[in-house]
């Protein structure tokens, strides 16, 4: 591969050779654009729109349109896209990922493809990681778009429905990944079509694309409503778990991020909860609470995974170190942490709607992204999103010096060396950005520096409000900034003249992250636009990466060398061991994301069907034909499922059939068994259908045509929403227990696909049954009002969607259990069809 790259160039270099002629055309139009009057720019926009309407393609007008934006930016905000930024713009327009280093002006680059694609009138979404960046970028670039005659909006967390509709109605809309995703879900929960805010998803430019499409890919967006379960059991499980002894009663698997009881722990659980067999299916509720309490107490770390603020548990984003206000762990883990920390335990929520970022962003007609670091994940971008990564050349050569890692035996020795390094460089006034992996480590380092008399700023989840301000000063002379991981990402660190002379920004990594990309992001904060700078990572054998995934050989070598805890080794072997540990973890995480996507694709296809059907109900003026189809399906399916063809049982089956339909849509005694006992199955269907349709026609006359159409819409929306919410729960429970199928030599993914499909078919049938039942039993006193079946109480990120424990709903009959009615059939083939 290396030899081929030398001969033909890398993939990016080959692709850039195709882009260069387009960029040459853009640059050649520079003089022409400079000669335009200010009022001509809006006229050019109208001209482009007209050309597109007449059949020209976006690529036909691209060189001229890009040249126009370039001149507009120069006149309005004093910034003119340089060649490399034009290349980046073309790459984004082509629906690819442009890898652009920090400080290369990604915000300005986005104006080029955003303008061109907005000319179609279908809207463009520019996605950032937080509200601050969305508003900042919109405010910075709005003058450019407005000068060109385009409208630009921004979606922020606190906007109401009307403001959101206005922002989405703009030509270009800035916003965060979570706001775009949640608005999509909310749009599919509205009861009037006028309440929807988003248009059809057209073109998206995702800033920090690796953070959103890879780091957060396992994070479903969840809109929750209030659950009914009591919270008392969380406290009981917490009390039990705190009485256990590590290793003896339970073990922790750090790689899987989980904890489980040993045989001795199981015995203790049986005694404590007074049950005979802890593993019994009827004790799943106990198992679930114990597993979550174990995880809360022994796996989840305060000030690393979560923090406490004003008596509330806040999730800390592991990638940015930011506190995620208003987000809760799902599946009872948040409640278990609340019980552990002795704060008020909130009720477990019910999922009303959910989607992952993977599936949300794959719905756009065209998707593109920008980031400083994407190449290490190129395979994943290509395989999951169909996006290739093109490395955009930097405007100035990178002058940053990346030093080799230094490795210490103990964490204590490592931090002593870090402090010594900081003190040494502080003396000469060199600014430093020190990256840590947790709030706890930030604060430990901070107290060590205080003892040495080194003034510094701490940037972590606890001080999120000051984030951008602190980061903007990090390049000043003598400034020391400690930051959790990627806090402050998206804000440039600009050097002062004195800081430049002192050596530029020094990056100190206090630990290697499990992803090389996150390390590269930290490094990339220094050396922007050809600035001087330096970086070095300090590693100890006690760090999580080395301890969990590192090689025992390294530990052996260090032991043989007899190193003191503050002695360092710099060795190629150690560096390559670190890299191979990172590759191992990256591969493992990619596999997890791929597997999760296979599971999520099942419910994603189902979601698309339900949301499409729901949309048709909202949009359609007349549901009469749809309702008549439902009536026919209910009657025909009832006949098919009740009549087995066994002569001796025929009379009984007919009576059961009549009873069943009387419960749904037949008035009592309208059809008697003797009326249909001499008919064939097909004749029975026609006779029953005729009777039911006559009642429907009578009801329509009685209520009035206009009003019954609205009643049908109200009923169908309520039934679809209720059944879909229950189905989400059912699919989640199926997924939680599906891993055990591997013990039966079954492929869990295939089993999930098959059973999930069966459950979906059942749900669709039950939607028809309930819709017909409610419609035939409706009594009208006043015009029906549409209302949501459940009230949204919160939005959520589920940080731990892997290896959840099954929860048992009280007194729930399994689909494959024998039906309690005594028919001798399985529940799913008997009363389960009617449930």
Curated annotation (Swiss-Prot):
According to its UniProt record, this protein's enzyme class is: translocase
What keywords sit in the KW lines? ATP-binding, Cell membrane, Cytoplasm, Membrane, Metal-binding, Nucleotide-binding, Protein transport, Translocase, Translocation, Transport, Zinc
Pfam families under this entry?
P-loop_SecA (PF21090), SEC-C (PF02810), SecA_DEAD (PF07517), SecA_PP_bind (PF01043), SecA_SW (PF07516)
- Domain of life, source organism: Bacteria
The cellular location(s) given in this protein's UniProt record come to: Cell membrane; Cytoplasm
Q: How does the annotation summarize its subunit structure?
A: Monomer and homodimer. Part of the essential Sec protein translocation apparatus which comprises SecA, SecYEG and auxiliary proteins SecDF. Other proteins may also be involved.
Q: Which family does it belong to?
A: Belongs to the SecA family.
- PANTHER family this protein is in? CHLOROPLAST PROTEIN-TRANSPORTING ATPASE (PTHR30612:SF0), SECA INNER MEMBRANE COMPONENT OF SEC PROTEIN SECRETION SYSTEM (PTHR30612)
Q: What is this protein called?
A: Protein translocase subunit SecA
Source lineage:
Bacteria, Bacillati, Bacillota, Clostridia, Eubacteriales
Q: Which gene encodes it?
A: secA
């Amino acid at each position: 591969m290396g030899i081929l790259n030398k001969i033909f160039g890398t993939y990016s270099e080959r692709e850039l050779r195709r882009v260069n002629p387009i960029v040459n055309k853009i640059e050649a139009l520079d003089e022409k654009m400079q000669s335009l009057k200010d009022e001509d720019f809006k006229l050019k926009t109208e001209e482009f729109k007209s050309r597109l309407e007449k059949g020209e393609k976006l690529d036909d007008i691209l060189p001229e349109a890009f040249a126009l934006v370039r001149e507009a930016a120069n006149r309005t905000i004093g910034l003119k896209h340089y060649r490399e930024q034009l290349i980046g713009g073309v790459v984004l327009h082509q629906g690819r990922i442009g890898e652009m280093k920090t400080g290369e002006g990604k915000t300005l680059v986005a104006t080029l493809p955003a303008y061109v694609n907005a000319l179609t009138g279908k809207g463009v979404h520019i996605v950032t990681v937080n509200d601050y960046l969305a508003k900042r970028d919109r405010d910075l670039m709005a003058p450019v778009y407005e000068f060109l005659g385009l409208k630009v909006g921004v979606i922020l967390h606190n906007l109401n429905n009307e403001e959101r509709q206005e922002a989405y109605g703009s030509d270009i809309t800035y916003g965060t990944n979570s706001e775009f995703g949640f608005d999509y879900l909310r749009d599919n929960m509205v009861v009037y079509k006028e309440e929807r805010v988003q248009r059809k998803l057209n073109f998206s430019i995702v800033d920090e694309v690796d953070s959103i499409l890879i780091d957060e890919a396992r994070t479903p967006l969840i809109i929750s409503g209030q659950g009914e379960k009591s919270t008392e059991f969380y406290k009981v499980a917490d009390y039990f778990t705190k009485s256990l002894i590590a290793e003896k009663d339970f073990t922790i698997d750090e790689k899987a991020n989980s904890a489980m009881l040993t045989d001795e722990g199981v015995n203790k659980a049986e005694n404590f909860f007074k049950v005979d067999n802890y593993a019994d299916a009827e004790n799943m509720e106990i198992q679930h609470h114990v597993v979550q309490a174990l995880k809360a107490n022994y796996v989840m770390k305060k000030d690393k995974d979560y923090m406490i603020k004003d008596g509330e548990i806040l999730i800390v984003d592991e990638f940015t170190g930011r506190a995620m206000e208003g987000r809760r762990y799902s599946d009872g883990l948040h409640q278990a942490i609340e019980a552990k920390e002795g704060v008020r335990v909130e009720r477990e929520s019910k999922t009303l709607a959910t989607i992952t970022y993977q599936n949300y962003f794959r719905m756009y007609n065209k998707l593109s992204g920008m980031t400083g670091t994407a190449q290490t994940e190129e395979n994943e971008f290509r395989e999951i999103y169909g996006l290739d990564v093109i490395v955009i050349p930097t405007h100035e050569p990178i002058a940053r010096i990346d030093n080799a890692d230094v490795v210490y035996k103990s964490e204590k020795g490592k931090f002593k060396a870090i402090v010594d390094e900081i003190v040494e460089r502080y003396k000469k006034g060199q600014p430093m950005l020190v990256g840590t992996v947790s709030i706890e480590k930030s604060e430990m380092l901070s107290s060590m520096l205080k003892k040495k008399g080194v003034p510094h700023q701490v940037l972590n989840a606890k001080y999120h409000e000051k984030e951008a301000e602190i980061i903007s000063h990090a390049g000043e002379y003598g400034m020391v900034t400690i930051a959790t991981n990627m806090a402050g990402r998206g804000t440039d660190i600009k050097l002062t003249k004195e800081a430049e002379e002192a050596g530029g920004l020094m990056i100190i990594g206090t630990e290697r992250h499990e992803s090389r990309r996150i390390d590269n992001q930290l490094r990339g904060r220094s050396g922007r636009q050809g600035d001087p700078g330096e970086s070095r990572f300090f590693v100890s054998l006690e760090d999580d990466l080395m301890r969990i995934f590192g090689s025992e050989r390294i530990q052996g070598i260090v032991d043989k060398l007899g190193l003191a805890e503050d002695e360092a080794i710099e060795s190629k072997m150690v560096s390559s061991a670190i890299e191979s540990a990172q590759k191992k973890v990256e591969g493992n995480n990619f596999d997890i994301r791929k597997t999760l996507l296979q599971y999520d694709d099942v419910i994603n296809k189902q979601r698309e069907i339900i949301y499409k059907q729901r949309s048709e109900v909202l949009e359609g003026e007349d549901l009469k034909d749809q309702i008549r189809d439902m009536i026919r399906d209910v009657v025909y399916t009832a006949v098919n499922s009740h009549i087995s063809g066994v002569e001796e049982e025929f009379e009984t089956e007919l009576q059961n059939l009549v009873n069943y339909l009387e419960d749904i849509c037949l008035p009592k005694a309208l059809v008697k068994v003797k009326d249909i006992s001499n008919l064939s199955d097909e004749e029975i269907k026609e006779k029953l259908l005729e009777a039911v349709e006559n009642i429907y026609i009578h009801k329509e006359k009685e209520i009035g045509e206009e009003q019954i159409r609205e009643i049908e819409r109200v009923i169908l929306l309520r039934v679809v929403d209720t059944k879909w919410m229950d189905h989400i729960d059912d699919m989640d429970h199926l997924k939680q227990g599906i891993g055990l199928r591997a013990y039966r030599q079954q492929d869990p993914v295939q089993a999930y696909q098959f059973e999930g499909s069966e459950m979906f078919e059942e749900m669709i049938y039950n939607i028809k049954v309930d819709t017909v039942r409610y419609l035939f039993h409706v009594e009208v006193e006043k015009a029906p009002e549409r209302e949501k079946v459940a009230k949204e109480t919160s939005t959520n990120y589920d940080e731990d969607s892997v290896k959840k424990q099954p929860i048992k709903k009280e007194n729930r009959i399994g689909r494959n259990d024998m039906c309690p009615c005594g028919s001798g059939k399985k529940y799913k083939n008997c009363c389960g069809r009617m449930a």
